[in-house]
């Protein structure tokens, strides 16, 4: 089996999503292995415009399995909105989309830290999208993050309370979109 990998050599926005969209009809598996919802790719499918931030663009290929790997950081609100938007067009998400149980979740506190960090840089700010991606990867590498697989546990909120949220003394509404109740196929590994 041949494998092709599309990798961007800049900071994103090179048009990877458009290239993948063109090529998806030739592949059985489309996998997203890293990144977050800071950018999106716009796809026209059956006369309708769709903007995807997390879900691979192979979702429109009726024969392709789409994977979201453990290197991807997922904003549950954006992810749920994408799924809801696609289901309005009767796309069979449940049989075509798998997500790693090790993919990390972007929390509201990650966005707060991102905004605070960017503001503190003054004229030297980096132009963050303020979507919490950098702080989520910091938690991932520091082994403090909340992962998709954690949502299966009855007491996943305890892990959240024991994470950096408790250390920095903030309070957040825990998963207001109820995305932890979505029925998705999760890859156990």
Identify what each model region corresponds to.
Residues 160-189:
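Catalytic phosphate/metal-binding cores of nucleic-acid and nucleotide-processing enzymes, i.e., regions
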Residues 1-159, 163:
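Non-transmembrane, aqueous-exposed alpha-helical and coiled segments at domain scale
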């Amino acid at each position: 089996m041949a494998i092709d990998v599309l990798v961007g050599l800049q900071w994103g926005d090179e048009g990877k999503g458009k290239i993948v969209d063109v090529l998806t009809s030739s592949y059985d598996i489309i996998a997203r292995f890293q990144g977050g919802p800071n950018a999106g790719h716009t796809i026209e499918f059956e006369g309708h415009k769709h903007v995807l931030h997390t879900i691979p663009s192979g979702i429109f290929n009726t024969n392709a399995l789409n994977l979201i790997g453990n290197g991807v950081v997922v904003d549950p609100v954006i992810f749920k909105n994408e799924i809801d938007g696609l289901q309005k067009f009767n796309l069979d998400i449940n049989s075509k989309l798998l997500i790693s149980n090790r993919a990390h979740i972007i929390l509201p506190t990650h966005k707060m830290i991102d905004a605070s960090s960017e503001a503190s840089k003054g004229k030297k700010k980096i132009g963050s999208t303020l979507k919490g991606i950098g702080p989520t990867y910091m938690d991932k590498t520091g082994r403090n993050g909340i992962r998709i697989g954690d949502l299966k546990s009855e007491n996943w909120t305890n892990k959240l309370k024991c994470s950096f949220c408790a250390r920095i003394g903030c309070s957040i509404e825990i998963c207001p979109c109820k995305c932890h109740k979505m029925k998705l196929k999760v890859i156990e590994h």
